[in-house]
Structures are given as C-alpha cells and as structure tokens.
C-alpha cells in the first residue's frame, strides 16, 4: 500500500440499506479500526467549501490521529535533528490512510464518497467541519484542540451521501 492508503475503488452497483444510526456506528467503528484515534460526523455546510468549488455530499466524516509527543519535544528541527518534521509528515500520512480506507468501505456499500487528506484538502476546509463534528474546539492560536489529545493531532475527512447522524460540537 501507498503511505497515504489505497486508491479509490469503484462504487458498488447496489446500495446496502441500513438506518442512519447503524451506518454511523459502522463508519465510526471502521475508522477507529483502521488507525483513526478520533471520529466525528457533521452535516455538510457550504461554509466548509472554498470559493470556486462545489461539494454535493450531505455529510462529512472527520478522522483525527494523535501525534507522538516525544517527537514533538524535539523542537525546533535542525540539520542534526529532523525528527519533528518527519513526525508531522508521518502523521499526515497516517491520518490519510483511515479516510482512504473508509472511502473505499463506503463505496463498497453502494454510496458516494470522496476522501480528503491534509494538510491541503483542496476544496474542503476541514477545520470548521471538525469543530462541528465534535473533534475539538478552536484555540486562540488557531489550532484545533481536542480534550484528550490537545492540539498535536492531524485530521482528514470523507464526504459522502451515506445516511448518517451528526455529532454535537
């Protein structure tokens, strides 16, 4: 597999029908079983989409992964010690993998899905979606802060039309 996870599969021809609360539980369990540390769901809001783009999926699933605090303690990076930037890149890749796996899971169930990986997710601004999905709150310094992990974690997302139930911010 690629460091950022598998390429998108083709969507299955038949939709599997379940209740929204059952899909919500399945989606969260799947992401957590595939390297995710946090999962939240929010209804899509046009404010999450950058100007010039259009996203039509009604839901956004945000997945977060924690970073290794020991590696972050090596700030600032230097020519002799490059572990901090390597850790950041490693965790962006780790955040991408559960979303790309989740994307393929949703496609295999007959629903539309698109994975968005950080740090630059083109059309999707993941920060407000993550706040609405209950992943964290916005800190004074502009970073997302999670109650358990603090600010050192990375996020990726999947937009989809699978029936879901949103989380509270």
Task: Annotate each language-model stretch with its function.
Residues 1-42, 51-56:
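Iron-sulfur (Fe-S) cluster-binding modules
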Residues 37-169:
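Catalytic cores of enzyme domains
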């Amino acid at each position: 597999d690629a460091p950022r996870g598998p390429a998108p599969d083709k969507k299955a021809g038949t939709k599997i029908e379940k209740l929204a609360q059952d899909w919500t539980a399945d989606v969260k369990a799947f992401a957590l079983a595939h390297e995710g540390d946090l999962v939240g769901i929010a209804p899509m809001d046009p404010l999450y989409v950058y100007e010039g783009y259009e996203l039509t999926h009604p839901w956004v699933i945000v997945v977060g992964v924690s970073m290794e605090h020991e590696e972050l303690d090596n700030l600032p990076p230097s020519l002799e010690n490059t572990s901090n930037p390597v850790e950041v890149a490693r965790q962006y890749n780790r955040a991408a993998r559960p979303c790309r796996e989740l994307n393929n899971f949703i496609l295999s169930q007959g629903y539309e899905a698109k994975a968005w990986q950080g740090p630059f997710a083109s059309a999707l601004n993941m920060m407000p979606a993550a706040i609405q999905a209950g992943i964290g709150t916005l800190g004074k310094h502009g970073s997302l802060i999670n109650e358990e992990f603090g600010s050192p974690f990375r996020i990726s997302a999947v937009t989809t039309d699978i029936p879901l139930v949103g989380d509270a911010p």
